[in-house]
Structure formats: C-alpha cells, structure tokens
Amino acid sequence: MSEYLFTSESVSEGHPDKVADQISDSILDAILEQDPTARVAAETLTNTGLVVLAGEITTTANVDYIKIARDTIKRIGYDNADYGIDYKSCAVLVAYDKQSPDIAQGVNNANDDPLDQGAGDQGLMFGYACDETPQLLPLPIWLSHRMVERQSQLRKDGRLPWLRPDAKSQVTIQYMDGKPHKIDTVLISTQHAPDISLDQVRESVIEEIIKPTLPQELIKGDIKFLVNPTGRFVIGGPQGDCGLTGRKIIVDTYGGAAPHGGGAFSGKDPSKVDRSAAYAGRYVAKNIVAAGLASRCLVQVSYAIGVAKPTSVMVETYGTGKVSNEILTQLVLDHFDLRPKGIVKMLDLLRPIYAKTAAYGHFGRDEPEFTWEATDKAALLRAAAGL
C-alpha cells in the first residue's frame, strides 16, 4: 500500500498578485464588452499606493483604464491606506502599446477557412482532471481555494470584521494508493487588524474558516492547524509585497498536481493560446474523466506562432484509462477543434467573463460563464470509445 503527502496552496483576492490579475482581467472584460476582436495583453504591477498598467492593446474600445483599476481595488476591499493600498488615493500609471504588427499578421490573416486563425504565440499547455472531487479537480487545490474564499466571505459580511483582504492557504492531504485518505495539515495566513490578539485570530480562523470547509470523511485523527505562524500579519497587500499579473499560475490551475506550460492567463484575450488552449485542455480532460474513460487524465497541446493546427496533442491517463492513450488521443482529435479560433468558438470565449476567473481558480468552479467546465461531450466520447 503506497502512502504519501501532497500539498497545494491558494491565495485570496486581496493577495497582491491576485489584485494585479483581477485588474488585468477587469480591463480585458471592459474591452471585450465593446470590441470582441480586440487584441489584449494587459499586465499590472501593484505596490504601496501605486498601480502600473502596461502591455499591448489593439482595440477600438474606449475604456477608462484608471477607473477600472480603482473600481477593482475597491471591490476587493482595499479602501484604507493602512491595508496596503487605497483605491481613492493610489496613483495609477498607464503605459500600453499596440500589438506588434509582426505578431498581428500571423494572428489576423486567416486562410479560406475562417477558423484557420494562427496561434498568437508558440507554447505548450496542459489540461487535467481527476475524480478526487465532484468538480473533477485535485482535492488539495480545491480545499485551498475554498478556505481563502470563505475568508473573503466572512470579511465582507462582517462576521469577522478584523480580517483584512490579504490571505493565503495551504492544505496537505495524505494519499493512500493514489486516493485522498485524510487531511494532514492546514495552514492559513491572514492579514488582520492590529488590535486583535494572535489567540483570537487562531481560534476564529480554525473554527470559522477551516473546520466548516473540511470534508468530514477525511477527518481522521489529529489535524495540524497552522494559523499566522509568524505571529502577526498586519502589513499586507501591495504594501507587504509587490504584486504582478501572472505570478500565481499554479494557484490558477491544479496546485502542482499536473504540469504547467508556463504561460499565465490573466489579461490575455482568447487569441492567446496560453489561456484559451489551457481552458480547452481542461475541457477535454474533464470530459474524458466524466465519461468514465479514466480516473485521471492529462492533456498536452502545443502550438507554433501563426499556425492554426496544434503541433502536438497528447493524452496521458496514468494507467487508469479504459482504453489506450492512443485511442483517447484520436478521440480528442476527432471530437474537439483545438485550433485557436476553433477553441474560441467551441467555448464561446469572446465574452467579458474573465474577471471572475482571476481569483479562487480558473477550474473546478460551477460558474455559468465557465464553459470549459461543462461535461457535455462525455456521453459522445463514451459512445465513440465503444463503452
């Protein structure tokens, strides 16, 4: 019987890197609302009292970037300079260029088939699904997301008014024979008001945030709870750490349970395969697992800049497949259009839906806008596999 520990982490919407992600995706949404064919690569930097907006944007949309940045910071809850940044008084610098014409000529010029739009860059992307949770997401990352999400809820509804926006979570699960067996360790670090004691923070976080989130069937023996291990977390947000778009790519995906191609998501329009192909990979993998064709599934897809057809597609099921990986790969090629424009059409991605993705995970969430979480091709795949 094999036994091991596996850990994943998440961060709250008030973490400085996530503040940057949400600003970038809020700007993307505002542009797509007016101009669905825009080319957007919106990067954000946050620091004490400062937001810098840079990148490449080609659009006909008329967008107030500074207002969007301030509104996003306000929505997150940074309305006091003592928290690390204040939406009312922070400086916002804007430095956008247009997309390079060298890139645009490979992305904009389609052949006879309008779906033959070239990829916006080279790269490799992964999608993953497993049967550890009803959402077909690995349990450690799913639990980590739910804990910081609950921290935000309790902060915003006033039940724990001393909570501040910045927080991190980390969950360690003991696995036996490849399946979650019990919860081993839970760590939460949360920003808080200066006048509350560490004992109060620890008791409230354990009782109000951690315990209500834990699956009862995995509580076996003592769980190690770690809350604010440094003893104090008053200085946080962009004051505690500089935040950058795209610096939480493992939090955004599978918590380290699957490989990552290295490309971030936030601030990028769907012509960027870093984002759209990763969403498509998740869609493919989730449908394979939902079809009962495997209990774990990894999909890799790769692209060349300016070329529509993927340079490779691979399916790996780690010995859990009901049919061979080669058969599954052919099923994917037969039933999913993985050209960039095909992905955009398949998942209806030219919509202002991205700000919601920028905190608490892009995957494993039951949101109506998240078309890549649908399992509408599971029955088709199962029938095509002869099961």
Curated annotation (Swiss-Prot):
ATP binds at residues 15, 166-168, 232-233, 241, 247-248, 264, 268. L-methionine binds at residues 56, 99, 241, 272. GO terms for molecular function: ATP binding; magnesium ion binding; methionine adenosyltransferase activity. Its EC number is 2.5.1.6. Its cofactor is Mg(2+); K(+). Pathway: Amino-acid biosynthesis; S-adenosyl-L-methionine biosynthesis; S-adenosyl-L-methionine from L-methionine: step 1/1. Keywords: ATP-binding, Cytoplasm, Magnesium, Metal-binding, Nucleotide-binding, One-carbon metabolism, Potassium, Transferase. Mg(2+) binds at residue 17. Binds 2 divalent ions per subunit. The keyword Protein biosynthesis does not apply. One of its GO terms (biological process) is one-carbon metabolic process. It is an enzyme of class 2 (transferase). It is found in: Cytoplasm. K(+) binds at residue 43. InterPro entries: ADOMET_SYNTHASE_CS, S-AdoMet_synt_C, S-AdoMet_synt_central, S-AdoMet_synt_N, S-AdoMet_synthetase, S-AdoMet_synthetase_sfam. The keyword Nucleotide-binding applies. It holds the Pfam family S-AdoMet_synt_M. Homotetramer; dimer of dimers. Catalyzes the formation of S-adenosylmethionine (AdoMet) from methionine and ATP. The overall synthetic reaction is composed of two sequential steps, AdoMet formation and the subsequent tripolyphosphate hydrolysis which occurs prior to release of AdoMet from the enzyme. Belongs to the AdoMet synthase family. PANTHER family: S-ADENOSYLMETHIONINE SYNTHETASE. This is S-adenosylmethionine synthase. The gene is metK.
